[in-house]
Amino acid sequence: RYTKAFIGCNGIFNSGITTYSLEEGESQGIPLDNAKNRYLLVDSTKFNRSDFYIFYDLFNFDAVITDNEIDPDVLKHYEEYTTIVTV
């Protein structure tokens, strides 16, 4: 088991974390399923964007870490699912 897992993704659409393939999604799910704390690292362009395969749920992340260019309305929407940290 891991203490913390940090991953990226191709898109976040509502509570779905997406990537381009089943294989990539399954491989990213392994460390997430085995971590005590889960963090998603994405730039602000990934919000409201979907890709082929939903591999994880945003509710299962302790926080999303993103840049400070995120639109305030988008930030407010996604804070309903988890903590959003801007840097």
Residue map of PLM features:
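Conserved phosphate- and dinucleotide-binding cores of soluble alpha/beta proteins
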Residues: 1-87
